[in-house]
């Protein structure tokens, strides 16, 4: 029968071509030519409808057998070609070579300093706490003996949240210091107290080499019987010795803070040696790192602690200034610049 003969010839030709193929792209072209919708095999079957029934059945069976044989041969050839291609690629791969390492991040210098500072105070008997960054007026100001007419309440220094209370007053803000956590802790705990509170604080200040609107602060509080300025000075001197080294100069001088009385400012000698062109100390040779003092009796009384029986001291330091002094960094904004050339140095 002529149709069966054509099918046999197409099959033999297809298998011969398949045997000679060496590239996967040629294999796909072969599939389209012999197994596609418009393949040679399909074309050979177009005249089957005009044949007698018996011949039509025989030709159809031959076509199905041919198609099955070609499909099986195609799949086998495809698998062998892929394995050969993979083997040729593997020959150029030295599996004994070490892989390319993934880039590993580093702990941010401010996080490193925060961990170091809290570790130092932990060895001095302090507990480490955290507090909310969104505060209310009472804990951020009133409870810390900051009256309503104090300049710190002005919008120029405080980020108020536009959510008035029942009286129409703005009562919610981004904390300007970590001191509110002192009040919250004393409201629920009685002396003896010895805590430090690290965290972000926010002040509406002009940005320059030593000031930014968001920075990191660590607040400390000690309340117990018989606490004096000697305890305050001894604690802070020991901290400076451990952090900066024994040869660094530390200066205490009087200052005013509403929630302590008396108050002191603590400064550390600048690495520039007092050069006039220094953008950090502006030629003074000193950089203030913290404010401190004896806790004001009114602050203790507000939280129900007897100020006649207990005394205490508090301090708050800007953490960005510590690595600036240690490493001679001349601009506080570098810590928040996301410049990997700077961050990789720590």
From Swiss-Prot:
PANTHER family: PHENYLALANINE--TRNA LIGASE, MITOCHONDRIAL, PHENYLALANYL-TRNA SYNTHETASE. GO terms for cellular component: cytoplasm. It comes from Dehalococcoides mccartyi (strain ATCC BAA-2266 / KCTC 15142 / 195) (Dehalococcoides ethenogenes (strain 195)). Tetramer of two alpha and two beta subunits. HAMAP family: Phe_tRNA_synth_alpha1 (MF_00281). GO terms for biological process: phenylalanyl-tRNA aminoacylation. Its EC number is 6.1.1.20. It holds the Pfam family tRNA-synt_2d. The gene is pheS. It comes from the Bacteria. Belongs to the class-II aminoacyl-tRNA synthetase family. Phe-tRNA synthetase alpha subunit type 1 subfamily. SUPFAM superfamilies: Class II aaRS and biotin synthetases, tRNA-binding arm. Keywords: Aminoacyl-tRNA synthetase, ATP-binding, Cytoplasm, Ligase, Magnesium, Metal-binding, Nucleotide-binding, Protein biosynthesis. The keyword Cell division does not apply. GO terms for molecular function: ATP binding; magnesium ion binding; phenylalanine-tRNA ligase activity; tRNA binding. This is Phenylalanine--tRNA ligase alpha subunit. InterPro entries: aa-tRNA-synth_II (IPR006195), aa-tRNA-synth_II/BPL/LPL (IPR045864), Phe-tRNA-synth_IIc_asu (IPR004529), Phe-tRNA_ligase_II_N (IPR004188), Phe_tRNA_ligase_alpha1_bac (IPR022911), Phenylalanyl-tRNA_Synthase (IPR002319), tRNA-bd_arm (IPR010978). It is an enzyme of class 6 (ligase).
């Amino acid at each position: 029968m002529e149709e069966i003969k054509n099918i046999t010839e197409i099959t033999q030709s297809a298998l011969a071509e398949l045997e000679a193929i060496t590239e996967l792209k040629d294999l796909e072209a072969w599939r389209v030519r012999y197994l596609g919708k418009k393949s040679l095999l399909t074309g050979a079957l177009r005249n089957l409808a005009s044949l007698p029934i018996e011949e039509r059945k025989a030709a159809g069976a031959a076509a199905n057998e041919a198609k099955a044989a070609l499909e099986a041969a195609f799949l086998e050839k495809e698998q062998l070609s892929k394995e050969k291609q993979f083997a040729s690629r593997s020959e150029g791969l030295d599996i004994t070579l070490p892989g390319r390492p993934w880039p590993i991040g580093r702990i941010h210098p401010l996080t490193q300093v925060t961990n170091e500072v809290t570790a130092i105070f932990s060895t001095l008997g302090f507990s480490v706490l955290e507090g909310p960054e969104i505060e209310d007026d009472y804990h951020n100001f009133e409870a810390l003996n900051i009256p309503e007419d104090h300049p710190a309440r002005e919008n120029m220094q405080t980020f108020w949240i536009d959510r008035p209370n029942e009286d129409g007053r703005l009562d919610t803000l981004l904390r300007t210091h970590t001191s509110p956590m002192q009040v919250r802790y004393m409201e629920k705990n009685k002396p003896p107290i010895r805590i430090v509170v690290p965290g972000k604080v926010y002040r509406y200040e002009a940005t320059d080499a030593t000031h930014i609107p968001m920075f990191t602060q660590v607040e400390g509080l000690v309340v117990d019987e018989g606490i004096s300025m000697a305890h305050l000075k001894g604690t802070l001197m020991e901290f400076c010795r451990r952090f900066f080294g024994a040869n660094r100069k530390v200066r205490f001088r009087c200052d005013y803070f509403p929630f302590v009385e008396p108050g002191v400012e603590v400064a550390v000698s600048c690495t520039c040696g007092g050069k006039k062109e220094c953008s950090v100390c502006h030629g003074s040779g000193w950089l203030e790192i913290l404010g401190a003092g004896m806790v004001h009796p009114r602050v203790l009384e507000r939280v129900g602690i007897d100020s006649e029986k207990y005394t205490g001291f508090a301090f708050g330091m800007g953490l960005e200034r510590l690595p600036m002094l240690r490493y001679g960094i001349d601009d506080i904004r570098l810590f928040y610049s996301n410049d990997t050339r700077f961050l990789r140095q720590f």
